């Protein structure tokens, strides 16, 4: 019994000594709180977002960028329908972007959903505690818009740029259509003008053929024209119809001769028109078909068949200059040779 008592006393002494030793140590230094005891952890939103991005199984939908200092949402539709309900109990992608905006995330690439924050880095989850939630976001957004700073856009980001591009393309297409319509209108006007000129040319050619046929069919007209030409040449002493050689220093007499030549040519033109009008009046009084009408009909047939062009392949200058040099006898011979154009017996 005494041995047991001694052992108990030894144990008691030993325990008392340890307590005394611990109390002596505690008295030497003041008590301190545990490190990080009063610090709060990162917000659940940041923790869930970090875990979602860090998960290799979701790399096809959301993952870190090549620099691993930002994350990219590759498929916004699948992100909204699968990941958001799993981590945040909702499927509103715009609400997720608003949450990023409140924690200071910024959009990196305007063409894709890439966001970055200085405290949101791959492999450094402990930096999430440095990301603080912003207050008075409405006032901050106004200040950022006024200073031209970029921020995360809420809603259907990217569609506005696409709409603007489509509007520009639409404006370019409308301008091109207007330009093509103007060109079409101008082309139609040019074609109409060319058709009008062609009709006028054909009409003049037909009138010329008709005039020549009637003139050659009426020997009185040819004889009267030849007599008048001969009389006027003898009266004025001019060789009408022949070309004159121009000198380097024309004299006053030469200029007067040229003036008389022009006046004489105008008179002859008026006389030809008067004779031609008289011939037409005489033929209008005759109801029976004449050789002139037969000639005109034949010439019209030739014009329709296209055979008149080869028969009338004569220069205009020759037609203008030659008749004024003919004598009366030459005209009679020509009319006699063209028996089918002569007057009726």
Swiss-Prot record:
Pfam families in alphabetical order: HSF_DNA-bind
Region called Hydrophobic repeat HR-A/B, residue ranges: 150-216
Post-translational events: Exhibits temperature-dependent phosphorylation. Sumoylated at Lys-315. Sumoylation represses its function.
Keywords recorded for this protein, A-Z: Activator, Cytoplasm, DNA-binding, Isopeptide bond, Nucleus, Phosphoprotein, Repeat, Stress response, Transcription, Transcription regulation, Ubl conjugation
Region named Disordered: 17-40
Gene Ontology CC terms: cytoplasm; nucleus
UniProt cross-references to InterPro entries, sorted A to Z: HSF_DNA-bd, WH-like_DNA-bd_sf, WH_DNA-bd_sf
Disruption phenotype: Heat-sensitive phenotype. Reduced expression of SGIP1.
Impact noted for substituting residue 315 to R: Loss of sumoylation. Loss of SUMO1 binding
Motif AHA1 location, chain numbering: 273-282
Stated induction or repression of this protein's expression: By high light and hydrogen peroxide (H(2)O(2)). Up-regulated by heat stress (at 30 degrees Celsius) and remains up-regulated transgenerationally in the unstressed progeny (at 22 degrees Celsius) via heat-induced REF6-dependent depletion of H3K27me3 marks within its coding regions.
Consequence recorded when altering residue 269 to R: Increases SUMO1 binding efficiency
One GO biological process term: heat acclimation
Short motif Nuclear localization signal, span: 231-238
Location of cross-link Glycyl lysine isopeptide (Lys-Gly) (interchain with G-Cter in SUMO): 315
PANTHER family referenced in this protein's UniProt entry, alphabetically: HEAT SHOCK TRANSCRIPTION FACTOR, HEAT STRESS TRANSCRIPTION FACTOR A-2
Domain notes: The hydrophobic-rich region (HR-A/B) corresponds to the oligomerization domain. AHA motifs are transcriptional activator elements.
Role description: Transcriptional activator that specifically binds DNA sequence 5'-AGAAnnTTCT-3' known as heat shock promoter elements (HSE). Seems to be involved in other environmental stress responses. Activates ascorbate peroxidase 2 (APX2) in addition to several heat shock protein (HSPs). Binds to the promoter of SGIP1 and activates its expression in heat acclimated plants.
Other remarks in the entry: Plants overexpressing HSFA2 show increased tolerance to combined environmental stresses.
Family, as annotated: Belongs to the HSF family. Class A subfamily.
UniProt-recorded name of the protein: Heat stress transcription factor A-2
Organism name: Arabidopsis thaliana
């Amino acid at each position: 019994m005494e041995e047991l008592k001694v052992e108990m006393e030894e144990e008691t002494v030993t325990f008392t000594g340890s307590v005394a030793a611990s109390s002596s140590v505690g008295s030497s230094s003041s008590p301190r709180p545990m490190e990080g005891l009063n610090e709060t952890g990162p917000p659940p939103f940041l923790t869930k977002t970090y875990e979602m991005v860090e998960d290799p199984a979701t790399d096809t939908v959301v993952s870190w960028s090549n620099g691993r200092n930002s994350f990219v949402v590759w498929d916004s539709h699948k992100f909204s329908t699968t990941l958001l309900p799993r981590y945040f109990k909702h499927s509103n992608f715009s609400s997720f972007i608003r949450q990023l905006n409140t924690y200071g995330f910024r959009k990196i690439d305007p063409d894709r959903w890439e966001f970055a924050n200085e405290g949101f880095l791959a492999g450094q989850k402990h930096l999430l505690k440095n990301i603080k939630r912003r207050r008075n976001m409405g006032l901050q957004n106004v200040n950022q818009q006024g200073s031209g700073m970029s921020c995360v856009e809420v809603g259907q980001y990217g569609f506005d740029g696409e709409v603007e591009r489509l509007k520009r393309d639409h404006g370019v297409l409308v301008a091109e259509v207007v330009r093509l319509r103007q060109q079409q209108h101008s082309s139609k006007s040019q074609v109409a003008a060319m058709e009008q000129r062609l009709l006028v040319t054909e009409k003049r050619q037909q009138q010329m053929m008709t005039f020549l046929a009637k003139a050659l069919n009426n020997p009185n007209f040819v004889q009267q024209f030849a007599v008048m030409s001969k009389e006027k040449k003898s009266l004025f002493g001019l060789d009408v119809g022949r070309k004159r050689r121009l000198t380097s220093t024309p004299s006053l007499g030469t200029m007067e001769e040229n003036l008389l030549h022009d006046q004489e040519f105008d008179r002859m033109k008026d006389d030809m028109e008067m004779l031609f009008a008289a011939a037409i009046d005489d033929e209008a009084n005759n109801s029976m078909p004449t050789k002139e009408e037969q000639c005109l009909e034949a010439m019209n047939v030739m014009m329709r068949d296209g055979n008149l062009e080869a028969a009338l392949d004569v220069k205009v200058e020759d037609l203008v200059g030659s008749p004024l040099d003919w004598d009366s006898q030459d005209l009679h011979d020509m009319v006699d040779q063209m028996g089918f154009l002569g007057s009726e017996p």
